[in-house]
Amino acid sequence: IITSISKDVSMLWPVNQSVAEVADTEENRKADISGRWGFDGEKITDLLTAEKARGMKGDEINAWRNAMEAANYTFEHNGRKWDYGKSTQTRLEPSVAAAKAGKLPEAFFWTDAENNDVPVTAEELIALSEAAEQAMFTKGMEIHIRQRTMKKELEKLTSADEILAYRVGWAQE
């Protein structure tokens, strides 16, 4: 049975200035470095409560949601695959503004998801932008619904171990 963990950080910071240094007390000897396990002198106890685990898993779900919302995806429009996502939207905005102002250069093109340069008119570019926004909205709703479902499922779990074992992601992953 492991009853203590220590880390030698003496080479990282000057003597007596390590952020890892703690007072050598009986109380400090009763918990491991993660704070999850305690030792009362006779037995090891799990200090992680279901509520703390739920908070940790909720943070993991939020991080998953943020990553999914920031990711790039593809969709079909007018027989081609196109990229969409926040970065695509950022790239499209100035070109769409130019299209709406009638200032697109001659022979303007947009590059599809398969890296083909596709000549587009102002109207086609605006339509592509609107289709990308709709695809983004649809994907955003899927992500939102999934993260809400995961959080509801999490609330039904009662033990820290069950909560920590819960898989974050799409249901089929």
Regions found by a protein language model. Name each.
Residues 2-173:
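A preference for well-ordered globular domain cores
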